[in-house]
Design a protein with these regions (language model features):
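Bacterial N-terminal signal peptides that target proteins for export
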Residues: 2-12
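Sec/Tat signal peptide C-region and signal peptidase I cleavage site
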Residues: 22-26
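Interaction-mediating elements
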Residues: 27-155
Length: 155
């Protein structure tokens, strides 16, 4: 039996996609406070006056330049993204399991009974809210997301 060797089309596509994510316009770039638009800083400081800022970055998101502010407030870490004119794009923040909506907690317990949650985040983009988790279950770590009603989402 003759064995074919070589690169499969799927492997070629995967390599191409991985390569594209390393291009400069596809990556987040760390920046200094002075490079963040004043309206972005003002919007953040108005909403989160007690947060300690840990860093700033910018990147292209769906063809639009956005600025992200990484912060900590008590036990909550938060990444808040704005457009250059100060419009809120998204908020990603850690949360305690006790703060989960009951339907999300129930769905998580059904999907991973006895699993250990490594990270829980609430992600808000406009009016859309999702809950993302890293969970250890049966010796494997998985990532999963749910909407507020406990329906599983694709991530």
């Amino acid at each position: 039996m003759k064995r074919k060797t070589g690169v499969t089309p799927a492997l070629t596509l995967a390599a191409l996609l991985l390569g594209l994510t390393s291009l400069p316009w596809a990556q987040e770039e760390q920046i200094r406070r002075k490079n963040v638009p004043a309206v972005v800083l003002a919007a953040f400081e108005k909403t989160y006056p007690n947060a300690t800022i840990k860093g700033y970055s910018k990147e292209m998101d769906n063809g639009q330049l956005v600025y992200e502010i990484e912060s900590v407030e008590g036990t909550v870490t938060r990444d808040v993204t704005y457009t250059a004119d100060g419009t809120l794009v998204s908020v990603e923040e850690t949360l305690e399991i006790s703060a989960l909506p009951p339907k999300v907690k129930a769905a998580l317990d059904r999907k991973f009974p006895g699993g250990k949650i490594r990270k829980a985040e609430k992600i808000t983009k406009g009016a859309v809210v999702a809950y993302e988790f890293k969970i250890r279950h049966n010796g494997r770590t998985s990532e999963i997301a749910f909407d507020p009603e406990g329906n599983e989402l694709q991530i």
